[in-house]
From Swiss-Prot:
EC number assigned by the record: 2.7.1.4
GO cellular component, one term: cytosol
Reactions catalysed, as given in the entry: D-fructose + ATP = D-fructose 6-phosphate + ADP + H(+)
Keywords, alphabetical: ATP-binding, Carbohydrate metabolism, Kinase, Nucleotide-binding, Transferase
Similarity comment text for this entry: Belongs to the ROK (NagC/XylR) family.
InterPro entries the UniProt entry points to: ATPase_NBD, ROK, ROK_cs
Gene3D superfamilies: 3.30.420.40
Protein name: Fructokinase
Residues where ATP binds: 4-11, 133-140
Top EC category: transferase
GO function terms (MF aspect): ATP binding; fructokinase activity; hexokinase activity; mannokinase activity
Pfam family, one: ROK
Reported function: Catalyzes the phosphorylation of fructose to fructose-6-P. Also has low level glucokinase activity in vitro. Is not able to phosphorylate D-ribose, D-mannitol, D-sorbitol, inositol, and L-threonine.
Length: 302
């Protein structure tokens, strides 16, 4: 049995999968924000609940909104900031009395979709989480690729490519929380989409409300979405030029905008070197379960 844990900002979730990937158990508990030791205890409780419910002992994989530095062995770049600077995998392994495999939550999405999701069987998968922020992960042959520095997939903190004059102005107006300017995340996260609509219309709306206006043929909402589609396509074309994945998978709140799957693939061709690109852009099959399923699959079938 494989147990996966997904640590989110508000909830921590466990899933137990059987040998064929079937769900045996799933449960959520509130994430104890700003309390490192209680976070470990919450995870231990969830693992115990899964094992009690199934009557089996499982391997444990963990997805977090950050990564482990290969140089210091502690968590870095986590927006769950109380994890930063902590040897989280070692402390969790000691508490659970077994090895715990840990990966960035976007890498878990990539693994999940590569194993039995929208990119099942693909050799190279690039998976994107587009929600409040913007992260990405890479899977090779169903296994997470973290890179030599532990930063593979940190796509959202590269500059938006091929900026037009308006985007150059926006870059100066809205710096990224990472301290740099012009990051992809500031443009194509759900937050960035809503902010661009506000710049165009003068009204603050949620992403879902803007999409509803698009469906009602509102011209300003339509313009905001077209700008978003082009920015997403430019950003993904950079990935194709460097990595050339077999499949691109979208997860997170913006992945529910169905029109993206008709438009973005064609727009990518305008920016890929040589103009040829048939890389499919697909919606995550497992939805909000992908991260926790991918954490479980950090222990692959041998």
């Amino acid at each position: 049995m494989r147990i996966g844990i997904d640590l989110g900002g508000t909830k921590t979730e466990v899933i137990a999968l059987g040998d064929a990937g079937e769900q045996l158990y799933r449960h959520r508990l509130p994430t104890p924000r700003d309390d490192y030791r209680q976070t470990i205890e919450t995870i231990a409780t969830l693992v115990d609940m899964a094992e009690q419910a199934t009557g089996q002992r499982g391997t444990v994989g963990m997805g977090i909104p950050g990564s482990i530095s290969p140089y210091t062995g502690v968590v870095k770049n986590a927006n769950s900031t109380w994890l930063n600077g902590q040897p989280f995998d070692k402390d969790l392994s000691a508490r659970l009395q077994r090895e715990v495999r840990l990966a960035n939550d976007a890498n878990c999405l990539a693994v999940s979709e590569a194993v039995d999701g929208a990119a099942a069987g693909a050799q190279t998968v690039f998976a994107v989480i587009i929600g409040t922020g913007c992260g990405a992960g890479v899977a090779f042959n169903g296994r997470a690729h973290i890179g030599g520095n532990g930063t593979a997939g940190e796509w959202g903190h590269n500059p938006l490519p091929w900026m037009d004059e308006d985007e150059l102005r926006y870059r100066e107006e809205v710096p990224c929380y990472c301290g740099k300017q012009g990051c992809i995340e500031t443009f194509i996260s759900g937050t960035g989409f809503a902010m661009d609509y506000r710049r165009l219309s003068g009204h603050a709306l949620k992403g879902s409300e803007i999409i509803r206006l698009v469906e009602e043929s509102d011209p300003v909402a339509e313009l905001a979405l077209r700008r978003y589609e082009l920015r997403l396509a430019k950003s993904l074309a950079h990935v194709v030029n460097i990595l050339d994945p077999d499949v691109i998978v979208l997860g997170g709140g913006m992945s529910n905008v169905d029109r993206l799957y008709q438009t973005v693939g064609q727009l990518i061709k305008q920016f890929v070197f040589g103009g040829e690109c048939e890389t499919p852009v697909r919606k995550a099959k497992h939805g909000d379960s992908s991260g926790v399923r991918g954490a479980a699959w950090l222990w692959p079938q041998e």
